Amino acid sequence: MGPPLWPDLQEPPPPGTSSQIRSPLLCDVIKPAPHHDVTVRVVPPPRFLPLLLRPLPSDGDIAMRRDRGPKPALGGAGEVEPGGMAASPTGRPRRLQRYLQSGEFDQFRDFPIFESNFVQFCPDIYPAPTSDLWPQVTRLGEVANEVTMGVAASSPALELPDLLLLAGPAKENGHLQLFGLFPLKFVQLFVHDKSRCQLEVKLNTSRTFYLQLRAPLKTRDREFGQWVRLLYRLRFLSASAVPFTQE
């Protein structure tokens, strides 16, 4: 295991620590300038798209083909955007997609993105399933430990996403800020607790974070099911673990 990218990282609190000790936030651990450490080659869209092989029948997975016309989305959630991503229920780009389209990240403007809002938690402080997760609210009314996580493809020719994006509210003004960009080959994603819609994110620096989906109750199970199918497609699940669960 190589040396950590950021030597000033603090270790998470040991099991049994008092609930008054706050879990380190992703935005505190991951510095806001990830582009100095990770270089992603962006392929410009071709004049014509190559003919891709038909994906295996998967009941509407997150295959990132740029076919025209409506297709079943993840979990049968209606139509999808170009690239096979599940379309927003309102028909408008979601928060992370709008942020990337604001002009600061021109290379990501046309990337199809699948994203969701999560709340970071520590299983030692908020053990599941005996206690609920209480978001940390700032003076600006924003959820301090909220994390917007999305996956994207750096090329329209890819059938699956190859980038993981992490964003959260800035401490200064509460506006969304991109603080993590990682190739998916350097990240491991697991289902931590399916019943509570919780994911485990393990970086190549051996740091592990836990995220719980923050979505309306009526759409939460369907949205989390999309992430489960994505994880299954990416083959990040351990063969020795219980299906869809990382012990």
Curated annotation (Swiss-Prot):
InterPro entries in the record: GARIL-like_Rab2B-bd
This protein's UniProt keywords: Golgi apparatus
Gene behind the chain: GARIN5A
Compartments, as annotated in UniProt: Golgi apparatus
GO biological process: defense response to virus; innate immune response; positive regulation of type I interferon production
Keyword Iron-sulfur part of the UniProt annotation: no
Protein family per UniProt: Belongs to the GARIN family.
Record note on quaternary structure: Interacts (via N-terminus) with RAB2B (in GTP-bound form).
Residue ranges, compositional bias (Pro residues): 1-16
GO cellular component: Golgi apparatus
Name under which the protein is recorded: Golgi-associated RAB2 interactor protein 5A
Job of this protein: RAB2B effector protein which promotes cytosolic DNA-induced innate immune responses. Regulates IFN responses against DNA viruses by regulating the CGAS-STING signaling axis.
Chain positions covered by the region annotation Disordered: 1-22, 60-92
Primary localization class, coarse: Golgi
